Amino acid sequence: MLAAADRVKALREAFPSEGLFAEKEWLISPQPFAIEEKRRADLERLGHQLFVFQRACNQLYQQSAKGKQPAWVARYLDLGKPAELIEFSRGKEFREDLPRVIRPDLVLTDDGWTIAEIDSVPGGIGLTAWLNQAYAALGAEVIGGAHGMLDGFAKILPRGGDIVISEESATYRPEMEWLVRQLQNRFPDREWRVAAAENYQPQNGRDVYRFFELFDLPNLPGIDALLAAAGRGELAITPPIKPYLEEKMWFALFWLQPLREFWRRELGDKYFRRLQGMIPYTWILDPTPLPQHAVIPRLEIHDWREAAKFSQKERDVLLKVSGFSPFGWGSRGVSLGADLPQAEWEKQIDDALAKFESEPTIMQQFHKGKLFDQPYWDAKRDELKTMRGRVRLSPYYFVEENRAELRGALATICPADKKLLHGMRDAILAPSAFAERAES
């Protein structure tokens, strides 16, 4: 086996000359992130559990819109969205359509993991595919193998197709262009392209992988033709044009007592209890007054404005813009209450309540990640070091015939002092592998 320095050198030499992310850097580890072998079955099953959850979300919204479930469910999920987009998303042509790529962001904990969120339009597909290829070439048995990500993506666009990406998402364009080159080499009988969303011209029978956010539609002047073609059944779009499925508030709806029996029935008791152990308790910051005798569950407050007075210890929660906003994706609209000065915390609560009708916000229990050790190469000192950090694990599941198959898992290892886990210059990005691992 190659020494660590030689492995890092080989990984650097394998890096695409065109890059993978625009103006983004990360630390390189000589080995994959090791996930305990005893977690294998749980991680492989998680994809189907989340597929069933998203299917239930789709059903709940549609039944709510038709009056067969409480009307307030659809009202919550439609907040801030234009009427024409709501109408389009309810079209009978797309009734059963669900995302074909499921990527949860998991924070690894002492007990396994908690699901921070499910990414609606996940980036990192090309990056994870490259990492899997590069580390597999060095002999690592990465999750999904060398070509799992490519094969999974090809399954969701079986006729080939276009990855349609917006300027707003341009950071990810290099990885998508790399992905298309690899797909073209591996599946030469199909045509693959990356195309700009701003002036995209749809073609009959040419399916689309959507890599643009739905809040960005007003900035995409040519997108009406794509939506019209999808409405006529001339092509398929994934993820589907369903803004209600892209709201983080689904985790709050999952915990609401009036919907408990719906979730138990649609998920099945086993999946329901399993998801209860992984989905953090979440609230919607709704300023609607409560009856005098009522309190907000678990917080024991009568009015959200009381939350503005929480102590620093009580503020160990996350505030997140729920969706359909430039602040609704990535880490842009996320803050940890315990890290905010009291005045800033109060302002964020007040702003969230004031913007409820146009840009709803959720509050979510914060789970601090477990510490792991991962080697990385310090380029400045030209030596191997060990980072003790917290891990965001992002498994990629590709939906194939109503089954979600695990095809790769990107590990983002952040320094121990970082509480919000996301890609950053001083984080390690590595593929994952199942292995026996000593406790850290």
Where are these regions (language model features)?
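Preference for protein termini
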Residues: M1-S440
